């Protein structure tokens, strides 16, 4: 069994409870417990593409990646195990969706690390479920209840938007900087000149703000956007449509589903996976960039100044430059150079 998160270890303390149940897993899944879980049936709803990739092979069609759960996936389940995410709004969105599909009488278990804010589950679900805390271990809480009332869920009710740099940005719960342009992205955008050309890939695109602002400034660029988050994919498509921009939006774990080369790769990459600090995605972004850029192609990213990206950039590209910086952020650029010539040298 792969390493389990503290939340999953708490669930396993109650494993006998689930042997005869038809279980649906959802929320901030960080391990492969559902693929090895003993129950009458197991289904998983993932809204993070890299989480779904771990589940798809062992569970097949019983693992689904999407923004909202499919009614057929949920219909046969009598028990929901929900992993609380760090974003309360995201939890409200997902649980409202799931509780609109699960029948009255279905049981729900909510688990999460104390620092995630899982304590607020009782309040969030109070209109539909009376939750009771049944376990506390590994700095996690586990809550249990029975659905008394179905929720009403309409996706249109959950959209927000803001305007920045002349671009209307459409956002959903769980999106980074949902309420406005963050300082790091603003610094990154300040380094671009208008009237660029070529193919641009925006990785970890969020609501699509970077790509959309660049396309407004440089209408001749061709856009590809990618993210692991189903909410980000949906938001980016909506942002492009709201601004009459064209582009391809792809669910991808960094480069897992990206083909071809690009003239520039841009990103404000995350350095957390859920609550955990993780540089894995950034390392994949930097190391993989050289295979998706031609000679002269550029990777341009913004990051918190304390993060160890210079060494990663130098290892992958040979060198890098800092285009802009503040006390908190730095914008790095690395360019693919020509490989050194091999052979015996020039003929005289």
UniProtKB/Swiss-Prot annotation:
SUPFAM superfamilies: S-adenosyl-L-methionine-dependent methyltransferases. It is found in: Cytoplasm. It catalyses: guanosine(1207) in 16S rRNA + S-adenosyl-L-methionine = N(2)-methylguanosine(1207) in 16S rRNA + S-adenosyl-L-homocysteine + H(+). Its main location: cytoplasm. GO terms for molecular function: 16S rRNA (guanine(1207)-N(2))-methyltransferase activity; nucleic acid binding. Keywords: Cytoplasm, Methyltransferase, rRNA processing, S-adenosyl-L-methionine, Transferase. GO terms for cellular component: cytoplasm. Pfam families: MTS (PF05175), MTS_N (PF08468). The keyword rRNA processing applies. It comes from the Bacteria. Its EC number is 2.1.1.172. Monomer. Specifically methylates the guanine in position 1207 of 16S rRNA in the 30S particle. Belongs to the methyltransferase superfamily. RsmC family. This is Ribosomal RNA small subunit methyltransferase C.
């Amino acid at each position: 069994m792969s390493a389990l998160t503290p939340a999953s270890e708490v669930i396993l303390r109650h494993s006998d409870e689930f042997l005869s149940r038809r279980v649906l897993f959802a929320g901030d899944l960080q391990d492969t417990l559902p693929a090895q879980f003993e129950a009458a049936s197991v289904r998983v709803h993932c809204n993070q593409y890299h989480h779904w990739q771990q589940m798809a092979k062992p569970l097949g069609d019983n693992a689904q990646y999407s923004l909202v759960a499919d009614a057929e996936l949920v219909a046969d389940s009598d028990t929901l195990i929900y992993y609380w995410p760090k974003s309360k709004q995201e939890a409200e969105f997902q649980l409202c969706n799931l509780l609109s599909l699960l029948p009255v009488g279905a049981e729900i278990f909510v688990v999460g690390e104390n620092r995630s804010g899982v304590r607020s589950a009782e309040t969030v679900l109070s209109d539909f479920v009376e939750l009771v805390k049944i376990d506390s271990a590994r700095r996690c809480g586990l809550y249990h209840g029975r659905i008394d009332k179905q929720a009403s869920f309409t996706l249109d009710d959950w959209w927000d938007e803001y305007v920045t740099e002349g671009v209307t940005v459409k956002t959903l719960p769980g999106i980074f900087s949902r309420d406005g342009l963050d300082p790091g992205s603003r610094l990154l955008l300040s380094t671009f000149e208008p009237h660029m050309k070529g193919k641009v890939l925006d990785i970890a695109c969020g609501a699509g703000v970077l790509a959309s602002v660049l396309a407004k400034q440089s209408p001749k660029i061709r856009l590809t956007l990618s993210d692991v988050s189903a909410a980000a994919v949906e938001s980016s498509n909506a942002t492009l449509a709201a601004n009459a921009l064209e582009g391809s939006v792809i669910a991808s774990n960094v480069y897992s589903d990206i083909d071809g080369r690009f003239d520039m790769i841009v990103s404000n990459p995350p350095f957390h996976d859920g609550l955990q600090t993780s540089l894995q995605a950034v390392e994949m972004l930097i190391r993989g960039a050289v295979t998706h850029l031609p000679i002269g192609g550029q990777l341009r990213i913004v990051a918190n100044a304390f993060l160890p990206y210079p060494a990663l950039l130098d290892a992958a590209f040979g060198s890098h430059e800092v285009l802009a910086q503040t006390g908190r952020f730095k914008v790095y650029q690395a360019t693919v150079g020509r490989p050194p010539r091999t052979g015996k040298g020039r003929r005289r």
